[in-house]
Amino acid sequence: MHVILYQDNSVPVVKVEVMYGVGSKDDPARKTGFAHFFEHLLFEGTANIERGEWFKIVSANGGRNNAYTTYDLTTYFEIFPSNQLELGLWMESERLLHPVINQIGVETQNGVIKEERRQTQDNRPYGNLISEVTRHLFPGTGYYHSIIGSIEDLDNATLEDFLNFHKTFYMPNNAVLVVAGDFKKDQAKRWIQQYFGPIPKGESIMRAPFVSHPITEQINAKFEDANIQTPMMVLAYKTPPADSREAMVLDFISSILSDGKSSRLSKKMVDDKKMALFIGAFNYALKNSGMYLIYGLPMGDFTMDDLVREVDEEIKKLQNELITEREYQKLMNQYENNFVQSNSTPEGIATSLATNFTMFGNANRINTELETYRSIKPEEIREVARKYLNPNQRLYLQYVPESPKPAPVVEEPAPVIEEPKVETPNAMDPKKKPKKVKKPKKSKKK
């Protein structure tokens, strides 16, 4: 396990973060959603932390915690008062070494994830946007499906399937531990050795090579969403992976086109011509590839095709003309400000360090990232726009309201059926105190 310590004693707070090099791209075939499932499942308890007690322990000790999954990684963290560092390290070592993975936990989290999918994807306006884009851009790869995966796949999965997935990816040699904030380095090192040292590093992970073919002709697609009333125009281009300098140039292009009211697309299409209710662009860099999205909501009598024509016109300008000095200085100021904000606290620095190690194999990238952005010249912006943002290299997705369905023919009145009421028991009774936790053993003084 790679360990990173970042000491900042200005505030009596410490963050313990463990990031694993497993994301939804690593989900097995016909078992989509496994990585995200484990984001939930590994809070179910351990051999020494009873089921349902994890969040209570953290809260009772003045802390907070969370976890998230992306296409490429999964991370867990606790933020505690600095005098609870040992507790945070012990809990994360428990998650790694002694997780309880059983049928009741799987069934419980399956229900939780079904509700999460309904809220964030299926019943949310434009909730299937990203999954529709990846389905067309990355067929046959781990990026083709949504992070949350298929409910059918999760329903069909067995306990053995989950155990095998855990055995493959959740081990020290696929993880990085970051401790950031107020702590004493020597003491932190002793605790890390005590709690993580005995854990077997695990076997090497055999990953299939990533193969994705370039787009040579515009892909035209349509998706109907019952949750929307206004159609959305979406243009998506396949772009280079996150470790490419060109991916950073594409970040700049996003800002030029749509970051703020004075950006090119926003000023032209929203303010001046009043063609769009909204227009946006962003670069989504992944470990093995990337995607660049431009999306907008047409206004009034304007159509999605009208928006596409205006977007193409602005991209042509980027491909043929250098940006102005004023735009260039605005970019520099924006990215310096963004970098400072993201890394202004030990908590933010911890995530940056863990992400840089997991995505790029180089935690020190945090010290060079801003300088790399500063070194990008207007000529590079023009060349990258020419290379990646062409009509024959993209998906044109028309994301539209669901077509009205014909009314069913009813020959006789349908019976009136009362909907049964189901009261969900309160899983977090405020009167119930957390059970006594077995304290971590104190390390012996040498």
Question: Which sequence ranges carry the predicted segments?
Answer:
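Proteolytic maturation boundary segments
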Residues: 1-3, 184-224, 267, 368-446
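M16 family metallopeptidases and their MPP-like homologs
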Residues: 6, 11-27, 33-37, 51-95, ...
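Active-site SXXK
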Residues: 32-46
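Short, polar/flexible loop-turn hinges at active-site or ligand-entry regions and domain interfaces
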Residues: 44-48, 96-104, 323-324
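Peptidyl-prolyl cis-trans isomerase
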Residues: 53, 98-107, 157
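Non-catalytic, conformational "gating/processing" segments within enzyme and secreted inhibitor domains
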Residues: 110, 159, 163-195, 393
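His/Glu-based metal-binding/catalytic segments typifying zinc-dependent metallopeptidases
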Residues: 118, 135, 204-262, 295
